[in-house]
From Swiss-Prot:
Substrate binds at K169, D201, T236, K237, F238, E239. It catalyses: guanosine(46) in tRNA + S-adenosyl-L-methionine = N(7)-methylguanosine(46) in tRNA + S-adenosyl-L-homocysteine. S-adenosyl-L-methionine binds at E90, E115, D142, D165. It comes from Paraburkholderia xenovorans (strain LB400). It is an enzyme of class 2 (transferase). PROSITE patterns: SAM_MT_TRMB (PS51625). This is tRNA (guanine-N(7)-)-methyltransferase.
């Protein structure tokens, strides 16, 4: 989910995942495999949000066509999109403005957006209706489970992860999305030669991203460190505000080894 970089206190208001031993009830008989699945890092933290009338209308009218229900099986994505085309996954599209803009400028590619928060889903559907975009599909579910169960290995042409929650406090860094195990899962779904593009406005997170992505043997950095912002990624309103305040933004673009 795209965060507001100026809302630095927000993570402290969020519920803490019950992954610590003291949060487990006495005598818990949960099987070890199930308990491990329950405790692992998820790609999101639940936030409340109000769905506007326009967003709700878009969900009612366009959701049946463009929202793909989560299912523990791999759909025929060519049938879902109605064609065979390069496919890009975006994890955490926030309110969808960036997703819609990129999709509008790349009509020959298909975009699969994963977002758990309902207002964001409604907002993107509303933009799709206003701009007559048909090359986007949405899954409202945890990205980890989507990758594991709905995306085939070596099938994606690109992945976008723009401004994920930075979990700015050191004790919360373990909750960050870009971790070695998640990156390994992500890379397994990329085609050889496909790209992974991450962006963040937190320098500490950018440094962690660079370290984690650089340590993944299947990835190669396209730049000497951080990459210039690719032209296809628009500057967000939060980014503009941050830049006016002197804040930095870091883009990282890696490719999966093995092409050609």
């Amino acid at each position: 989910m795209i965060h507001d970089p100026n809302d630095a206190g927000l993570p402290d208001q969020l519920p803490t995942p019950s992954s610590e031993a003291e949060n487990s009830p006495a005598g818990d008989t949960t099987p070890p495999e199930e308990a491990l699945h329950r405790r692992r890092i998820r790609s999101f933290v639940t936030r409340a949000g109000r769905v506007s009338t326009g967003q709700r209308r878009a969900m009612d009218e366009l959701g049946p066509r463009f929202v793909v229900p989560f299912a523990p099986q791999q759909p025929d994505w060519n049938s879902v999109f109605g064609r065979e085309a390069p496919r890009v996954l975006e994890i955490g599209f926030g309110m969808g403005a960036t997703t819609a803009e990129i999709a509008s400028h790349r009509p020959d590619e298909d975009f699969l957006g994963v977002e758990v928060h309902e207002p964001g889903v409604g907002a993107l559907l509303k933009l799709m209706g206003e701009q007559n975009l048909s090359n986007i599909r949405i899954i409202q579910h945890d990205a980890v489970e989507v990758l594991e169960q709905m995306i085939a290995p070596d099938s994606l042409d690109g992945v976008h992860i723009f401004f994920p929650d930075p979990w700015h406090k050191a004790r919360h860094h373990k909750r960050r999305l870009i971790q070695p195990k998640f990156v390994a899962l992500l890379v397994s779904r990329l085609k050889p030669g496909a790209y992974l593009h991450c962006a963040t406005d937190w320098q500490n997170y950018a440094e962690q991203m660079l370290e984690v992505l650089g340590a993944e043997p299947s990835l190669k950095n396209t730049a000497d460190g951080y990459a210039p912002r690719p032209e296809y990624r628009p500057v967000t309103k939060f980014e503009r505000r941050g830049l006016r305040l002197g804040h930095g933004v870091w883009d990282l673009v890696f490719r999966k080894r093995g092409a050609g």
